[in-house]
Each structure stands twice: as C-alpha cells, then as structure tokens.
C-alpha cells in the first residue's frame, strides 16, 4: 500500500506542471464583445512621404520619352533622403558653431558647399539662390 501513497503526490505534481505550462492563448482573458467587432472600422494607413512625384516631374522635364522603374525610383528617393540628412546635419552644426538658434539660407548654402563636390556645389548654389529669389519675389 505504501507505493500507492507515493503515486498520489506524483500525480498531483503532474497536474501542477501542466497547469503551469499553459499556452499563451490559454492565459489570455477572453476577448470582450465590444472589442471583437472590428468589421466596421478600417485601419488608417500611416502616410509615408516620398519624393517620387517630384523625381518623376523632373525626369519628364529633362527626358520626356524616358520612364523609370520602381526600384530605380526607390533608389532615387533614398538618395534624396540621404543628401537631405547630410545637408540638414551640416547646417545644424554650422548654426551651433555660430551660436545661432535658426538655420538660415546662409547655413544651407555653406553646407551645400561643404557636402557637395566642386562643380556640383556651384550649380546647386546657383539653382538654390534662383529658387529663393523666386520664392521671395512671389
């Protein structure tokens, strides 16, 4: 009879371990009736801003007969984001060095000269100056 007495605690121990090893689904409380009805509600998409339409407009101005693949468009978008981050970072450094709280067109112009090489910087500065004068006159 002694062996039977020893088996009972083992059986109780097995029940405890199975209760402790419940799956995540079993541990979760049942879903409420209010939260379960999601058919009527649509999930709003997070808007992602890209330069794709502007890249396409410039492409059509320069080469109206040429298209661009989605992968090339994605690469161009990444390129513009990268250049923007570099220019913004350099402009912020310049403003900090000069102890100015704002980034002006002067900081942007200087950062363009520092970030972009040679002839490309000259063209970018002239186009930027032209855009700023057009903006202020309008």
From Swiss-Prot:
A Gene Ontology molecular function term of the record: protein heterodimerization activity
Location within or outside the cell: Nucleus; Chromosome
Residue positions where N6-acetyllysine is found in the record: 7, 27
Annotated stretches, region: Disordered: 1-46
Glycyl lysine isopeptide (Lys-Gly) (interchain with G-Cter in ubiquitin) crosslink residues: 134
Any one Gene Ontology cellular component term annotated for this protein: nucleus
UniProt modification remark: Can be acetylated to form H2BK6ac and H2BK33ac. Monoubiquitinated to form H2BK143ub1; may give a specific tag for epigenetic transcriptional activation.
Pfam families registered for this protein in UniProt: Histone
Database matches in SUPFAM superfamilies: Histone-fold
Keyword annotations of the record: Acetylation, Chromosome, DNA-binding, Isopeptide bond, Nucleosome core, Nucleus, Ubl conjugation
Biased composition (Basic and acidic residues): 1-18, 26-38
Domain of life, source organism: Eukaryota
Record text on subunit structure and interactions: The nucleosome is a histone octamer containing two molecules each of H2A, H2B, H3 and H4 assembled in one H3-H4 heterotetramer and two H2A-H2B heterodimers. The octamer wraps approximately 147 bp of DNA.
Miscellaneous section: Phosphorylation of H2B was not detected.
Function (record text): Core component of nucleosome. Nucleosomes wrap and compact DNA into chromatin, limiting DNA accessibility to the cellular machineries which require DNA as a template. Histones thereby play a central role in transcription regulation, DNA repair, DNA replication and chromosomal stability. DNA accessibility is regulated via a complex set of post-translational modifications of histones, also called histone code, and nucleosome remodeling.
Family: Belongs to the histone H2B family.
Name the UniProt record assigns to this protein: Histone H2B.3
